[in-house]
């Protein structure tokens, strides 16, 4: 959702008095705020749209921004920091979705497994959403309590989709708040630690914003972001890459009840009480403390 290798080019003027349906579609695209990233009034901002919606994004003073959209398409934008970190974030504002939309702390990381092909991770701490629960169809990874509410953890895979490194296949990490809200405090260390404990490794942080996302829907939001305490965490210590020959795969338990770890997830090791089978790949011991689905 965030490939910024090119900007949209304005179309030529519409000729004639009577516009065709195709003309209307192109006009809607021209009326959208072009995708961009940068710094505004002390905050990093990121705005991306696929051009399919009539969408307007505006940077306001400080950490505040507004966005409105309609007529379909995919878009996401907000203000925050680059790089992301385990900071405590406060935010407030208004959020009025009509259809599929999220309000979330949203960010990206790179290289969660340094010895493998470079990968990216897209993460969401979802505070509010429209008609579609983003955890639908994702794999449950546990739960964590934060700021008086339960957040449910999930993991999903995106295949050949836009990312900070172009089109890629990558993991999505989710923490979805049971009771929706538009305003409060989010301590990102809580969620980074919970994901890591569930075998969902993060890597090196890229940007982190409090974002509004819309997908073939309509709505508006005006959000004010503050915070910044904490520091960019060092990536969790990772086991050394396996030497040749690789250790033999760990035999998964017989099929039955329970769920298996996703690819790249933890599946064993001394003291590990989670899943010991893999929904994709095979469980391979990296050392006595850590086995992983590869």
UniProtKB/Swiss-Prot annotation:
Query: What catalytic activity does the UniProt entry give for this protein?
Result: Endohydrolysis of (1->4)-beta-D-xylosidic linkages in xylans
Q: Per the UniProt entry, what are the Gene Ontology biological process annotations, in alphabetical order?
A: xylan catabolic process
* Record bears the keyword Hydrolase: yes
Which keywords describe this protein according to UniProt?
Answer: Carbohydrate metabolism, Glycosidase, Hydrolase, Polysaccharide degradation, Signal, Xylan degradation
Signal recorded as keyword: yes
The GH11 domain, residue ranges: 31-226
Looking at the record's lineage, which domain of life comes first?
Eukaryota
Q: In which pathway does it act?
A: Glycan degradation; xylan degradation
UniProt domain CBM1: residue ranges: 259-294
Enzyme Commission numbers on file: 3.2.1.8
Q: Which InterPro entries match?
A: CBD_sf, Cellulose-bd_dom_fun, ConA-like_dom_sf, GH11/12, GH11_AS_2, GH11_dom, Glyco_hydro_11
The task this protein performs is described as: Endo-1,4-beta-xylanase involved in the hydrolysis of xylan, a major structural heterogeneous polysaccharide found in plant biomass representing the second most abundant polysaccharide in the biosphere, after cellulose. Exhibits immunity-inducing activity in Nicotiana benthamiana. Can induce strong oxidative burst, activate the expression of defense-related genes, and increase resistance against oomycete and fungal pathogens in N.benthamiana.
The record's family statement is: Belongs to the glycosyl hydrolase 11 (cellulase G) family.
Name this polypeptide is given: Ethylene-inducing xylanase 3
What organism does the UniProt record list as the source?
Verticillium dahliae (strain VdLs.17 / ATCC MYA-4575 / FGSC 10137)
């Amino acid at each position: 959702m965030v490939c910024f290798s090119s900007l949209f080019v304005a179309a030529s003027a519409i000729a004639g008095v009577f516009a065709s349906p195709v003309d209307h579609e192109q006009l809607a695209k021209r009326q959208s705020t072009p995708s961009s990233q940068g710094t505004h009034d002390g905050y990093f901002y990121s705005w991306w749209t696929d051009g399919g919606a009539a969408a307007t994004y505006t940077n306001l003073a400080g950490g505040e921004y507004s966005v409105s959209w309609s007529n379909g398409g995919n878009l996401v934008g907000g203000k925050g920091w680059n790089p992301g970190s385990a900071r405590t974030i406060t935010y407030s504002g208004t959020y009025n979705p009509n259809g599929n939309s999220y309000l979330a702390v949203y960010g990206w990381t790179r290289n969660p497994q340094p010895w493998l092909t470079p990968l990216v991770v897209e993460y969401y701490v979802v505070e509010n959403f429209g008609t579609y629960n983003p955890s639908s169809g994702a794999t449950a990874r546990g739960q964590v309590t934060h700021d008086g509410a339960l957040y449910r953890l999930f993991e999903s895979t995106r295949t050949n989709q836009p990312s900070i490194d172009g089109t890629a296949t990558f993991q999505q990490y989710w923490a979805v708040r049971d009771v929706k809200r538009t305003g409060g405090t989010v301590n990102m260390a809580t969620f980074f630690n919970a994901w890591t404990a569930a075998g969902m490794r993060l890597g090196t942080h890229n940007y982190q914003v409090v974002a509004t996302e819309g997908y073939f829907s309509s709505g508006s939001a005006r959000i004010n972001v503050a915070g910044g305490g904490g520091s960019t965490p060092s990536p969790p210590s990772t086991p050394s890459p396996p030497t040749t020959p690789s250790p033999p795969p760990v035999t998964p338990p017989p099929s039955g009840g329970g769920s298996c770890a996703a690819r790249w997830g933890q599946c064993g090791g001394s003291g590990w009480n989670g899943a010991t089978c893999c929904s994709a790949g095979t469980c391979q011991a990296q050392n006595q403390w850590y086995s992983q689905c590869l």
